[in-house]
Amino acid sequence: MSTVVIIGAQWGDEGKGKITDFLAEKAEIIVRYQGGNNAGHTVVVDDAEFKLHLIPSGILHPEKLCVIGNGVVIDPQVLKQELDSLAERGVKTGRLCVSQRSHIIMPYHRKMDAVEEEQKGEGKIGTTKRGIGPTYTDKASRVGIRVVDLIDKEEFPKLLKNNIECKNEIFEKLYNTKGFEYEEVLKEYQGYAEMLEPMTEDVSVLVHNAIKEGKNVLFEGAQGTLLDLDHGTYPYVTSSHPTAAAACLGSGVGPTKINRALGIVKAYTTRVGEGPFPTELNDGLGEEIRKNGNEYGTTTGRPRRCGWFDAVIVRYAARISGLDSLAITKLDVLSGLPVIKLCSGYRYKGEIIREFPASLKELAKCEPVYEDFPGWSEDISNVTRYEDLPENAKRYLERIVELTEVKISLISVGVKRSQTIILEDLFN
C-alpha cells in the first residue's frame, strides 16, 4: 500500500495533470482534494488532448475510482459539461464519486466574484471569476450549501431562499446590479441534485477503508504552493490550500496515512494573474519560452508570465509540504537555448537571502541571483533514460537538486505518457 500526494511547488500550471495521469496507472483511487474549476489539468492520451477542471485526471484510466473530496468546491454546471464531454469522447465516467461535504458553487458566487474583482480596479487579484473565492467565503461564514444539502429536497429550498434574499440585497444596494430569481435557480439546481445524488459518498470512509485494505491512493492537488491562502504571495493567492496538509483536510484522512509528497515543478517558472514574480522575463526570451511551452491557461486562456527556475520558491514549497521528491516537467522546452539561468537566491538591500519573504513589499525589491548553465541543442523529447540526457541537461538538473535539497523522481520531456523518464517508482 502506498499513498502519494501531488503538489504544485510553484504558482500552479506545473504539469500536475500529466503527472497524475501517468501515476494513476499504478493507483487504484485518485482523489482531488482542494480548489475547484479554477484548476486546468491537460492530459494527452494517444494524441488526444483532454482538458479537465473538476474531474480527477485519473478518469482517463479505465477501472480507476475517481473521487472529488470535501475540500473541493463544485460547480455542478461545469461538472455536467465535463461529464457530457467525456462521454461524447467514449470515456466512461461511472467511476466518479463526490463527497457529501463538498460545497456547491452557486450563480451568485460567480457574479459576486466578477463584481468584486471589477470593484478592485488597479488592485485586482487576477481571479478566474469562477466563483471559487465567494464559495469558500460562504463556507467559512457557515452559510454555504453542501452536496448533502443540495440533494435534501426539504432543506435545499429553504437554504437557497435565505441565501438569494441576502445576496440580492448586496447586489442591488451595494453594487447597483440585478440579483437572481429564486424559482429559476431552484429549478436549475434541483436538476443538478438529481445528477449528483447517485455519485454521493462519504469520501472519508471510502478513502480510509481503501488505505486500510492496502490500496494505492493518489491525491491530486490543484494550483500551486505559492498560491496557498496562508503560505502564498498573499493577497495574490487562491482561496484554498494547495499543500500536502490539505490532502488530509480535503479528503478526511489523517496525516499518518500519507506516505509520500511529490512536488511538481517546471524546468522554468510561470505565473498567471497579478502578483510578484522575481525571475520573470519581460523580453523576447520570455515570449519564446511561452511559445515553445504553449504557456496559455487551460481554464482562462490567458498568456502565462514566464521566467527562469526559482530555487528559492521551490525550496520554500518543499519545506511547507515536506516534499520527498520532485517531478520536473517541460525540460524539453529549454532545448535550443544557448544559456539557461537558475535563481539560487535573492539580493535584498545588498545582502543575499535564501528564504522566501512574507512581505510582498520586500519581495518586489528582491533581485534574483542567477547561476548560468550552458544549454543543449539536442531534441530530448524521446529520451526515456536519465543516462541518455545531454550532459548539460543533467548538470542543470543536478544543481536543482542541490539548491532545493529535494531529489528528482520523474522528468517529463513531452505531453505524452511515454515521454516520461522514471528515476524512482513512487508506489514501491
UniProtKB/Swiss-Prot annotation:
Residues reported in the UniProt entry to bind IMP: D13, E14, G15, K16, N38, A39, G40, H41, T128, R142, Q223, T238, R302
Catalyzed reaction equations: IMP + L-aspartate + GTP = N(6)-(1,2-dicarboxyethyl)-AMP + GDP + phosphate + 2 H(+)
Keyword terms, alphabetized: Cytoplasm, GTP-binding, Ligase, Magnesium, Metal-binding, Nucleotide-binding, Purine biosynthesis
Pathway it works in: Purine metabolism; AMP biosynthesis via de novo pathway; AMP from IMP: step 1/2
Subcellular location: Cytoplasm
Gene Ontology CC terms: cytoplasm
GO biological process, one term: 'de novo' AMP biosynthetic process
Pfam families to which the protein is assigned, alphabetical: Adenylsucc_synt (PF00709)
SMART domains, per the entry: Adenylsucc_synt (SM00788)
Residues involved in Mg(2+) binding: D13, G40
Major subcellular location class: cytoplasm
Family from the record: Belongs to the adenylosuccinate synthetase family.
Record's protein name: Adenylosuccinate synthetase
Organism: Desulforamulus reducens (strain ATCC BAA-1160 / DSM 100696 / MI-1) (Desulfotomaculum reducens)
